[in-house]
């Protein structure tokens, strides 16, 4: 008999984990929850892209009793090729399989980094193919208008010419990449999820 805990079954790891004990998920990993309620999406791990806050966010959401899947993008680093400054290094992208995996859920939480222009252009490419309501989690202070200016549909501000299928329903800023996420930020994410899951 479990005392004070709810069991969650997670079908985990498409590929072997990285680091000591395999604790870090590699790019292309999809860990599916028992029910398709929420999916948390992380950028690809690398020197600059650390998946650490995503692990803590996911743990907090699951601890709140919400069924949660996790996807680590295969090409999550860099910026999209259609961004104004272009992509000098790696190029951000979304595979058709990844879009299908995300779209099976009711709500998406995606963690971006701390460069404003990278965040908004990555979000536009992501939401071009992801059709479910999405919560953006990032470090940089951004608002709905920043996204709407480049054609991203948002709950508060609709662009004149929408370029996305999906809609941003909430933005949570101040979550630093590679650092432990403060409990108040995790609580804020959980409250947003509960609000938009209905």
UniProtKB/Swiss-Prot annotation:
<keyword id="KW-0484">Methanogenesis</keyword>
<dbReference type="InterPro" id="IPR026327">
    <property type="entry name" value="Me_CoM_Rdtase_prot-C-like"/>
</dbReference>
<dbReference type="InterPro" id="IPR007687">
    <property type="entry name" value="Me_CoM_Rdtase_prot-C"/>
</dbReference>
<protein>
    <recommendedName>
        <fullName>Methyl-coenzyme M reductase operon protein C</fullName>
    </recommendedName>
</protein>
<dbReference type="Pfam" id="PF04609">
    <property type="entry name" value="MCR_C"/>
</dbReference>
<dbReference type="GO" id="GO:0015948">
    <property type="term" value="P:methanogenesis"/>
</dbReference>
<comment type="subunit">
    <text>MCR is composed of three subunits: alpha, beta, and gamma. The function of proteins C and D is not known.</text>
</comment>
